[in-house]
């Protein structure tokens, strides 16, 4: 068994599939949780303030 480049060719499964709620390719097939909207983890849509672009505040 070797590690490195030869082992990378064995990774063929799709980790994420299309989400039923948001439609993005973010639903983890094994964990059954969407990384984008939180489907499978919570009833509410996943949203955080750090994902939004903040307005530029003048420094002087």
UniProtKB/Swiss-Prot annotation:
This is Large ribosomal subunit protein eL37. Zn(2+) binds at residues 19, 22, 34, 37. Its cofactor is Zn(2+). Keywords: Metal-binding, Ribonucleoprotein, Ribosomal protein, RNA-binding, rRNA-binding, Zinc, Zinc-finger. GO terms for cellular component: cytosolic large ribosomal subunit. Binds 1 zinc ion per subunit. It comes from Methanoculleus marisnigri (strain ATCC 35101 / DSM 1498 / JR1). GO terms for biological process: translation. HAMAP family: Ribosomal_eL37.
